[in-house]
């Protein structure tokens, strides 16, 4: 018996402010689509403005998944995403609808399409120990500690990159092996994704300055919508702190510093825009490492229409 060819699944990927939502909704207007978010910030509840979460009107156009599923105090990993996304794709197809993956968290996409490395799950006790060490010695000291056991990882991290330094030390403490060595090992394979062929459609700028201008405009619009008040409400809960993954999201970290009195308003705004541009740069680096991607110029006048055509070609096989 002939084996069924893998089902093509369109994945609309792109950096911040590249027009992913507009393109996805254009497709949703023409097909029975359900959108699966590929975004590590949209998973968090109570974080709407700073994540540019789709509005209730936009979500009414088509069902959206993996949005508002986690409390900001909790963690959500690439492994969690992979399991959820594969389950959802199967459920959406079983309903007779078309799954469309949309987002910009490239680590999630890599986990989905290439499998997972054999890294341990987060350990609250180890993290608490490292947080205490950092409070006493400072993150540069922990960066030096990391360099002694995993020089490869330490070399690519800034001395104050607390999130990644902590994770790399945590992995070493739990496994006795450098994280760089574990990441270099072949990813664990399974049969869960073998029935699908995930096709990346990349919204990339022909003129990066256009994207930079959009990023600045979007951050200013977030501020005008009440982003600072949103962060104030999160702080008022009392159970959140700047070390949590949710509060390390771009924009939230800068707003938290501002509300702590560490920066003034204009500096916070400029740092937020700069951090978003740096995120965009990293996203584009990931995208350009995908030779199989279909490229759509997000600066084109009809970028949404071009992306729509690409999605329809993928779905048609």
Swiss-Prot record:
This is tRNA dimethylallyltransferase. Substrate binds at residues 16-21. InterPro entries: Dimethylallyltransferase, IPT, P-loop_NTPase. Belongs to the IPP transferase family. It comes from Paraburkholderia phymatum (strain DSM 17167 / CIP 108236 / LMG 21445 / STM815). Residues 39-42, 163-167, 248-253 are annotated as: Interaction with substrate tRNA. SUPFAM superfamilies: P-loop containing nucleoside triphosphate hydrolases. Keywords: ATP-binding, Magnesium, Nucleotide-binding, Transferase, tRNA processing. Its EC number is 2.5.1.75. GO terms for molecular function: ATP binding; tRNA dimethylallyltransferase activity. It catalyses: adenosine(37) in tRNA + dimethylallyl diphosphate = N(6)-dimethylallyladenosine(37) in tRNA + diphosphate.
């Amino acid at each position: 018996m002939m084996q069924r060819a893998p089902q093509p699944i369109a994945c609309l990927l792109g950096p911040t402010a590249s027009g992913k939502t507009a393109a996805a909704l254009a497709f949703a207007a023409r097909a029975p689509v359900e959108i699966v978010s590929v975004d590590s910030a949209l998973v968090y509840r109570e974080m709407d403005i700073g994540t540019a979460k789709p509005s209730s009107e936009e979500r009414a156009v088509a069902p959206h998944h993996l949005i508002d599923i986690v409390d900001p105090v909790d963690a959500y990993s690439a492994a969690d995403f992979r399991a959820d996304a594969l389950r959802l794709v199967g459920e959406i197809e079983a309903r007779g609808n078309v799954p469309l993956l949309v987002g910009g968290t490239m680590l999630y996409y890599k986990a989905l399409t290439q499998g997972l490395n054999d890294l341990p799950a987060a350990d609250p006790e180890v993290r608490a120990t490292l947080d205490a060490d950092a409070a006493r010695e400072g993150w540069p000291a922990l960066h030096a500690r990391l360099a002694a056991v995993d020089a490869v990882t330490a070399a690519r991290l800034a001395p104050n990159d607390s999130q990644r330094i902590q994770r790399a030390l945590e992995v070493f403490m739990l496994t006795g092996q450098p994280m760089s060595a574990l990441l270099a090992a072949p990813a664990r394979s399974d049969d869960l994704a073998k029935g699908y062929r995930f096709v990346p459609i990349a919204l990339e700028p022909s003129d990066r300055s256009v994207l930079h201008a959009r990023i600045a405009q979007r951050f200013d619009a977030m501020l005008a919508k009440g982003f600072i008040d949103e962060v104030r409400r999160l702080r008022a809960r009392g159970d959140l702190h700047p070390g949590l993954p949710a509060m390390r999201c771009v924009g939230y970290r800068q707003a938290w510093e501002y509300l702590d009195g560490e920066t003034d308003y204009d500096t916070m705004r400029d740092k937020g825009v700069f951090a978003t541009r740096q995120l965009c740069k990293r996203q584009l680096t990931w995208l350009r490492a995908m030779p199989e991607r279909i490229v759509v110029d997000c600066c084109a006048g009809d970028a949404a229409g071009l992306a729509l055509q690409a999605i329809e070609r993928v779905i048609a096989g």
